[in-house]
Amino acid sequence: MKNAKMIGFGLYTPKNLVENERLQEFLETSDEWIRTRTGIERRYISLDENTSDLAVEASKKALNQAGLSAEDIDLIILATVTPDNFTPSTACIVQDKLGAKNAWAFDINAACTGFIYALKLGRSLIRSGEAKNALIIGAETLSKALNWEDRGSCVLFGDGAGATVLTSTEEDCGIKCVNVKSDGSKGDSLVIQGLPLNSPFKDGREVSENYINMNGREIFKFATKVMEESIVEILEKENIKIEDIDAIIPHQANLRIIDYVVKRLGIPREKFITNLQNYGNTSGASIPIALCESINEGNLKKGDNIIMVGFGGGLTWGAALIKL
């Protein structure tokens, strides 16, 4: 049976690197305060590149590594909560900028779980024969959705993009399993408001503040619970043991969340790949950035079994088992 195999990887960040100390210039915070509570030391903040620009640069690297041209791609799925516009989709903008004229393209919004959702869709479309070569992207410019006066949230996030090329294969490798879930009843724990209803037929005017609004305590409880459950479910579904897993790539939100799950599951800490100290929380881009960086630095190799696990707004969560 056909499967979807990852053959190209690319990541891209803006040039503007912001160390924790820079935030002290306008916030009541410190490097120590941020590091001890989150593990984050620095992040990249875009000055003039939008989400599509970051996605294009990451995609070019992935295509180059895959040995494919943009015209070889017949599907583009872009996971983001910070699109360039409401419409057209950022994926369509990326399609145009890349010259991927043979691809159909669309965005998905599953917040920090977006890349996992996109992998599930890409895999399904390849397995069904609807696509042969798919470009799967996670890209965010979260800096434009931050309240830069709120030290509890603005210190957490960064901008960036990660991309991978999937192709159809008969080999015993690729995306082995993907589980995704949602719970809209708790969606108000993490919100970026949309446009208010302000027609002339409505009494009064609504004001919307389009900033990330997060209940940190609720998100911590949710994240630690579903990360643990998602890893266990993947292992049980595929009838494999944690000893068979070479690496786990979690959503890069907070080191406290990751360390809590490590302790709960009794998994060796070295199995968990973390790089949030250098990027912050890049939402839908965090898992592909960590994946691409690990592969490009030689920390992951062909034949490795990897679990990627995410959680985010929606609420959404899920995990994928990959054999490189």
UniProtKB/Swiss-Prot annotation:
Which pathway is it part of?
Lipid metabolism; fatty acid biosynthesis
The UniProt entry, under InterPro entries, shows: ACP_syn_III_C, ACP_syn_III_N, FabH, Thiolase-like
So which residues are the signal peptide here?
A: none
User: Where is the protein localized?
Assistant: Cytoplasm
Comment block on domains: The last Arg residue of the ACP-binding site is essential for the weak association between ACP/AcpP and FabH.
Q: Name one GO molecular function term.
A: beta-ketoacyl-acyl-carrier-protein synthase III activity
- What keywords tag this UniProt record? Acyltransferase, Cytoplasm, Fatty acid biosynthesis, Fatty acid metabolism, Lipid biosynthesis, Lipid metabolism, Multifunctional enzyme, Transferase
Q: Which organism is it from?
A: Clostridium perfringens (strain ATCC 13124 / DSM 756 / JCM 1290 / NCIMB 6125 / NCTC 8237 / Type A)
Q: What is this protein called?
A: Beta-ketoacyl-[acyl-carrier-protein] synthase III
Q: Which Pfam families match?
A: ACP_syn_III, ACP_syn_III_C
